[in-house]
Amino acid sequence: MAENMVWDPLRRKNVPLTPEERVRQWFITVLKDRMQVPLHMMMSEVGMKFGEGALKKEFRADIVVYDRRPGPMMIVECKRPDVELTKEVLEQALRYDMVLDVKYLPLTNGNRTIFCERLEDGNISFLK
């Protein structure tokens, strides 16, 4: 494997090792080893579309975690270590949530991780 590539166990292929990809692979390991999420219940780079016609835009969620019910339960938004976890990063994850309808929205840059929970009333709770 080339030095600038890394094996992605979710996509089952080598991918370029960018700073964001390093964070994504680290968080996949956290989910698998610390949170006991099986690899077969995760997907990375999940494509989705917003809007219609000329307004249609395509986006990709960094990591989506599924549970035993049909559908996803978590969207993980990964950023490079030098990117702050701002309101804009949360809003990006919330746009994905409009399509996937998940309960949990972790945001991470590898240095800091914020776990957000979407409540039934639509509000966001920041978990510790």
Question: Which stretches of residues belong to each language-model region?
Answer:
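A short, conserved, highly charged catalytic patch centered on acidic carboxylates
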Residues: 1-104, 110-128
